[in-house]
Every structure is written in structure tokens, then in C-alpha cells.
Design a protein with these regions (language model features):
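A sequence-composition feature that detects small, non-aromatic residues
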Residues: 8-11, 16-22, 29, 88, ...
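Extended, small-residue-rich solenoid/repeat segments and analogous flexible loops
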Residues: 1-65
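C-terminal/domain-terminus segments
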Residues: 167-191, 195
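Short, solvent-exposed secondary-structure boundary motifs
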Residues: 15-19, 114, 169, 180-181
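A residue-level signal for beta-strand positions that form part of recognition/binding surfaces
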Residues: 31, 147, 187
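Flexible, glycine/small-residue-enriched loop-and-beta-strand segment within the central core
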Residues: 38-166, 193-204
Length: 204
């Protein structure tokens, strides 16, 4: 009986965890589609969770980096080519979501995408940032974190960046190239650097 790509992915993932004395609670629905060169890496001795729900898809060259984190991907989620999920916290994608080519998610604490959230090409979500303290102290060692929440049926256009401590409501559109640094109310169109918002003329 031929080994499917999904079965090979599960075996490789378990071996990658064992190689660095990490653990992974792994649940991959039977009909999940795994592309070519999809990789999962683990921090040594970390404890991790990876769940992928029914009818979801990880396309070619997706990289998942688990650093003692939890990833819960619901049903009918498409993670397209060359995306990166770098997770030390808790990442939840509820379902019915496209995450398009080259998008990057850095999750240190908590990132939650409600159903039907869409990320276009090269979107970045990062719930942490670095800062300076003194001239000879490396900025990389100083980290601030804060969760990201994105509401139902919200669309992030290409090359949007969402920073820490951000809540975006439902039925929003975030314009291409925008940087979101604060709260965006439900039913808003937001754009710019930093993004400002105005009401979206919704048909209801």
C-alpha cells in the first residue's frame, strides 16, 4: 500500500520532534491535503500542539516552526505556498480561511482569526516587537507582546502588517500595504501607515 503525502508528513513531523526531545500532540484530519516540501521544526524539549481540521490544505513549501506553541487550524483553511507559521504562543484559525502566498504569522502569545478571515499575499501578523533600552544593549533581547484578534469575514489585502495589541472587528477591509497598530471597529475600511479607518458602506 502506497504511503500518502499526509502519512509521510505525520511520520516526518513525529521524527522531527523526537530528534530534539520535543513532544507534539498531532491531529491531522484524514482528508487534509499536504503539498510538497512542507516542513515542521521544533525547539528542543518543547511541548507543542498541531491540529489541522477537515478539508484543509497546506500547499508546497509551507514552513511551520513550533517553539512550545499551539496551532489549531479549523476546517477548510488553505495555507498557500511559501507561508511561514512561527508559533510559541497559541494560534487559532477557526475555518473557511485562505492564507495566501508568502504570508508570515509570528505568534508569541495569542493570535485568533475568526471564521472567513482572509489574508492576501505577503501579509504579516506579529504579536511581538522589540525596543531599545540603552546604547549597548541589543534590541533583540527586549520584547513586548500583545494579542491579535481578527473578526469574522474580514479581509486583509496584500502586504498588510498587523502589529501587537490589535483587535480588528468583523466585516472589515484592510487596504494593501497598511500597517495596523490599534483597534479597527466592525464594518470599517482601514488603510495607511499607520492605518486609519472609516465606515465601510455595507449592504445591510
Amino acid at each position: 500500500m502506497r504511503t500518502t503525502r499526509r502519512q509521510a508528513f505525520i511520520a516526518r513531523t513525529r521524527l522531527a520532534a523526537a530528534a530534539v526531545n520535543a513532544t507534539v500532540d498531532l491531529h491531522i484530519a484524514p482528508d487534509v491535503v499536504i503539498g510538497r516540501d512542507v516542513r515542521v521544526t521544533f525547539d528542543p524539549r518543547s511541548r507543542n500542539v498541531l491540529q489541522i481540521g477537515p478539508q484543509s490544505r497546506l500547499e508546497d513549501r509551507v514552513l511551520v516552526q513550533l517553539k512550545g506553541g499551539t496551532i489549531r487550524i479549523g476546517d477548510r483553511v488553505q495555507i498557500r505556498r511559501d507561508c511561514v507559521l512561527n508559533v510559541a504562543g497559541e494560534l487559532t484559525v477557526e475555518g473557511d480561511s485562505p492564507i495566501s502566498w508568502g504570508s508570515i504569522i509570528h505568534c508569541s502569545t495569542r493570535i485568533h482569526l475568526e471564521r472567513m478571515v482572509g489574508l492576501a499575499e505577503q501579509v504579516t501578523l506579529a504579536d511581538s516587537s522589540h525596543f531599545f533600552t540603552e546604547p549597548d544593549a541589543h534590541f533583540w533581547h527586549n520584547v513586548r507582546t500583545g494579542s491579535i484578534e481578527i473578526g469574522r469575514n474580514t479581509w486583509l489585502c496584500p502586504k498588510v502588517t498587523v502589529t501587537r495589541d490589535v483587535k480588528i472587528g468583523s466585516h472589515c477591509i484592510i487596504g494593501a500595504g497598511s500597517v495596523v497598530v490599534g483597534e479597527v471597529p466592525t464594518g470599517s475600511l482601514a488603510s495607511g501607515v499607520p492605518a486609519t479607518f472609516r465606515p465601510l458602506p455595507l449592504p445591510w
